Regions:
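Bacterial extracytoplasmic/cell-wall-associated proteins, especially those involved in peptidoglycan
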Residues: 2-204
Length: 204
């Protein structure tokens, strides 16, 4: 069995598909394509990347799960190492990740509609039961919530060292976040964000 032989399961199988350019013949069988992707995955995880994952105390699959959250959290490539560092700080401190992208994934999974656009996470959403909802579970979800690109994976492996534990979208710098190392600082940032999102009439 391919999954068992390669320590894969239905939750983490997407991890072996590293977004990149590949040469594939039009008549390649699904099995040959799958095997090629696994081979490319193993090549991607060279000595340098493998050692960095080991230093983090994470498996390759866990790195990719975290990278998938980082990618959805920040579309800004230059901010991703900072976001990755924040999540790694929370894991180190045994805190729940409380990552909104996992809640959005949970909502879409719950309603079986992955095409819906969710611009605002509501408090009731945080209570949805799912092994992917990092407000409910401790640690990482059992697999990626998207196929992270190479920049997101490398952002985790080359994370920024800092003391941040909290973040919220920055209303005055679109696409970026405001970071805080304590709850009081985060609450100030959060109040500013809530005022902004309410002023835009965004309620879902």
């Amino acid at each position: 069995d391919f999954l068992k032989k390669n320590n894969l399961n239905n939750n983490n199988i997407l991890s072996i598909f590293i977004p990149n350019s590949y040469n594939v013949y039009w008549d390649t069988s699904p099995e040959d394509f799958r095997d090629k992707m696994l081979n490319e995955f193993n090549k991607f995880w060279d000595k340098d990347r493998s050692e960095k994952a080991k230093e983090l105390g994470l498996s390759k699959f866990e790195v990719i799960s975290l990278a998938s959250i980082v990618q959805i959290e920040s579309r800004k490539i230059d901010e991703r190492p900072r976001v990755a560092g924040l999540y790694l700080n929370r894991l180190r401190d045994n805190m729940r990740l409380q990552a909104d992208p996992t809640v959005i994934y949970t909502i879409k999974e719950y309603y079986k509609n992955f095409d819906t656009i969710i611009r605002r996470v509501l408090y009731r959403d945080l209570k949805l039961d799912s092994k992917f909802n990092t407000y409910k579970i401790k640690g990482l979800p059992p697999g990626p919530i998207t196929m992270p690109d190479i920049s997101a994976i490398d952002a985790v492996l080359n994370f920024e060292k800092h003391n941040y534990l909290f973040m919220v979208a920055n209303p005055s710098n679109k696409g970026y976040h405001l970071f805080a190392s304590d709850l009081s600082g985060h609450n100030r940032n959060k109040r500013a964000y809530i005022r902004w999102i309410n002023s835009k009439g965004i309620y879902r």
